[in-house]
């Protein structure tokens, strides 16, 4: 799936998760198709402890999580809508337990992400990842794990457990592990099973020089000044067109993080800009 894709930071909290009922999946998927996206990176959750998808393993490990089960399986609906349009779904998840939810951190056996992850946590988190991997099966073409800052002490067996969980249900997934932003980190290999650069680059250079790597080339940057922020675009259509073209030449991916409104719709001005950038030349 080389070429252009979109990332969204859709992150309802425990107080707003009921609003997921209003998310317009068809409008969302149609917006991606209009922009000619080949893939989507979708957040399952981040650090507030709320997820947009049910997870049986999480509820076994942390029974209190059942109280915050979402009212619909949004990633499943999105995945099916994307499959109908030939767009690949990549799931986003932090590499560590939600750092702003002490209760979930405790029952999952995790500590601060600035410290090495305990073996108990790796086992628990792997079971959570496996549950989602098997729930979505071939609908999920990949995983993008954020915050892979400290992997010190993870044993070979621990990595094998986590990597097997990420591949469960579809063995040929893209797997990216994000160790940080910028030229020094966007292309790092942070896990034995990683096959895709995480790609995070807040200020991409005018032209890419893909570093020698066994990983598939990838650059990920927000269209606006910050992730998921509703604001004016930072880039012109020509800049986007050039980056997308260079990623294709490298047989890689260029992903643009784009904000959504409360109903899951892209901002019209952003859609128009990206459509211009991805338009096929006559």
Model-derived regions: residue spans:
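Mature catalytic domains of secreted/periplasmic carbohydrate-active enzymes
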Residues: 1-282
């Amino acid at each position: 799936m080389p070429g252009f894709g979109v990332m969204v930071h859709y992150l309802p909290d425990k107080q707003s998760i009921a609003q997921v009922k209003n998310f317009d999946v068809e409008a969302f998927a149609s917006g991606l198709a209009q922009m000619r996206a080949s893939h989507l990176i979708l957040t399952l959750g981040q650090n507030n402890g709320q997820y947009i998808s049910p997870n049986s393993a999480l509820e076994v490990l942390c029974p209190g999580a059942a109280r915050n089960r979402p009212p619909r399986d949004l990633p499943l609906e999105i995945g099916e809508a994307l499959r109908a349009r030939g767009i690949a779904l990549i799931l986003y998840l932090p590499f560590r337990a939600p750092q702003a939810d002490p209760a979930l951190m405790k029952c999952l056996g995790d500590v601060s992400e600035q410290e090495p992850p305990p073996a108990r946590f790796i086992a628990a988190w792997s079971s959570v990842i496996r549950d989602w991997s098997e729930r979505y099966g071939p609908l999920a073409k990949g995983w993008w794990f954020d915050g892979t800052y400290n992997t010190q002490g993870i044993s070979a067996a621990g990595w094998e457990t986590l990597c097997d969980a990420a591949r469960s249900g579809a063995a040929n997934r893209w797997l990216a592990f994000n160790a940080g932003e910028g030229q020094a980190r966007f292309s790092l290999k942070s896990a034995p099973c990683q096959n895709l650069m995480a790609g995070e680059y807040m200020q991409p250079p005018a032209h890419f020089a893909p570093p020698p790597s066994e990983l598939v080339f990838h650059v990920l940057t927000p269209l606006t000044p910050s992730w998921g922020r509703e604001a004016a675009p930072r880039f012109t259509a020509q800049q986007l067109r050039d980056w997308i073209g260079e990623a294709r030449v490298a047989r890689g991916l260029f992903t643009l993080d784009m904000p959504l409104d409360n109903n899951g719709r892209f901002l019209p001005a952003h859609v128009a800009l990206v459509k211009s950038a991805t338009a096929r030349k006559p």
